[in-house]
Curated annotation (Swiss-Prot):
This is Large ribosomal subunit protein uL4. Coiled coil: none annotated. The gene is rplD. One of its GO terms (cellular component) is ribonucleoprotein complex. Part of the 50S ribosomal subunit. It comes from Xylella fastidiosa (strain 9a5c). SUPFAM superfamilies: Ribosomal protein L4. The lineage of its organism: Bacteria, Pseudomonadati, Pseudomonadota, Gammaproteobacteria, Lysobacterales. The keyword Cytoplasm does not apply.
Length: 202
């Protein structure tokens, strides 16, 4: 299949495996959930009754005082420990490489099918000016959208001029992830990025 290059009459032949496969919602959902879970720090911690600082002496006599109680560090008391206290743990989920790559291909294919994928010859700016970068984006007619720009190489000027725009994310092919792709309204790829993506996924 061929993708039209924006601002040119030329087309770019691309692999059907990457940009023309069927969309698998279940697979993409699985990969996105796994990616987000793996990013969790998992540092939540609470103190159980054995970890709370306090005496373990019986708080009152056994008989004649209502309900029977022992130490005041029990979970039912204010300042006591937490029942079933949370401990630091890893939320990471194993994802097979083949599954991950299939999901990325599925996302690219669906973006292409919905007309949310644009290809440009190159995307670079000569000066570190947000105004210059914004004008370049305006020519793509995607103003007001959450925009992801994927380039085969990111220059310092491109990085500096884009970082002040809240709805624009500029990444290299190596920094791509499923959450960024799914969360973008429009994805802009340079010709060089398309070739690198095909090398990675095919």
């Amino acid at each position: 299949m061929d993708l039209t290059i924006v601002g040119s009459d030329n087309t770019l032949p691309v692999s059907d495996v990457v940009f023309g496969r069927e969309f698998s919602e279940a697979l993409v959902h699985q990969i996105v959930v796994a990616y987000r879970n793996t990013a969790r720090s998992g540092t939540k911690a609470q103190k159980s009754r054995s970890q709370v600082s306090g005496t373990t002496k019986k708080s009152k006599k056994q008989k004649g005082g209502g309900a029977r109680h022992g130490a005041l560090t029990a979970p039912i008391f204010v300042g006591g420990g937490v029942a079933f206290a949370a401990k630091p743990r890893s939320f990471s989920q194993k994802v097979n490489r083949k599954q991950y790559r299939s999901a990325i291909c599925s996302i690219f294919s669906e973006l292409n099918r919905q007309g949310r994928l644009k290809v440009v010859d190159a995307f670079d700016v000569e000066v570190s000016k947000t105004k210059v970068f914004a004008e370049k984006i305006k020519s793509l007619e995607v103003v007001g959208s959450r925009l992801l720009i994927v380039s085969d190489g990111i220059s310092e000027c491109l990085s500096l001029s884009s970082r002040n725009l809240p709805c624009v994310d500029v990444r290299s092919v190596q920094a791509l992830d499923p959450v960024a792709l799914v969360g973008s309204d429009v994805v802009v790829l340079t010709v060089g990025a398309v070739k690198k993506i095909e090398e990675w996924l095919v």
